[in-house]
Amino acid sequence: KESAAAKFZRZHMBSSTSSASSSNYCNQMMKSRNLTQDRCKPVNTFVHESLADVQAVCSQKNVQCKNGQTNCYQSYSTMSITDCRETGSSKYPNCAYKTTQAQKHIIVACEGNPYVPVHFDASV
């Protein structure tokens, strides 16, 4: 079974590019990372930074998660991210996404030993 940390990497990490390559980026990535397998995942964020830099956020600014838990952390610096949001015309299995590139602080939930990101909570 895929670990929570491995799932975070599959769903949210794209260190190979510094930003979204094209407006088609989300359509390609959401499919290749298996985020459209049994349904269209409505919203997803990819982070274009090294895994080490994203894992380091777990020792940065402690903030409350959207669900009220206290194991969320906000990055001190902004990071290159791509937001993928399902379009109005999207219909499973032909999931369609709008690609939006941004520089924002990320908020992740961390757990385990080693203490690593397991959930992408928000960007601010």
UniProtKB/Swiss-Prot annotation:
State which residues carry a glycan (glycosylated).
Answer: 34
Subcellular location, in the record's words? Secreted
| Active-site residues, record numbering mapped to chain | 12 (proton acceptor), 119 (proton donor)
Matches recorded under InterPro entries: RNaseA, RNaseA-like_dom_sf, RNaseA_AS, RNaseA_domain
Alphabetized, the UniProt keywords read:
Disulfide bond, Endonuclease, Glycoprotein, Hydrolase, Lyase, Nuclease, Secreted
Quote the catalytic activity from the record: an [RNA] containing cytidine + H2O = an [RNA]-3'-cytidine-3'-phosphate + a 5'-hydroxy-ribonucleotide-3'-[RNA]; an [RNA] containing uridine + H2O = an [RNA]-3'-uridine-3'-phosphate + a 5'-hydroxy-ribonucleotide-3'-[RNA]
Enzyme Commission number, as recorded: 4.6.1.18
MF annotations from Gene Ontology? lyase activity; nucleic acid binding; ribonuclease A activity
| One Pfam family this sequence matches | RnaseA
Identify the enzyme class. lyase
- What would be one Gene Ontology cellular-component term for the protein? extracellular region
Q: In which tissues is it expressed?
A: Pancreas.
Output the GO biological process annotations, alphabetical, semicolon-separated: defense response to Gram-positive bacterium
The entry's substrate-binding residues are 7, 10, 41-45, 66, 85
Primary localization: secreted
| Cystine crosslinks | 26-84, 40-95, 58-110, 65-72
UniProt function note: Endonuclease that catalyzes the cleavage of RNA on the 3' side of pyrimidine nucleotides. Acts on single-stranded and double-stranded RNA.
- Please report which protein family the annotation says this sequence is part of: Belongs to the pancreatic ribonuclease family.
Q: How does it assemble?
A: Monomer. Interacts with and forms tight 1:1 complexes with RNH1. Dimerization of two such complexes may occur. Interaction with RNH1 inhibits this protein.
Q: What is this protein called in UniProt?
A: Ribonuclease pancreatic
Task: Name the gene that codes for it.
Answer: RNASE1
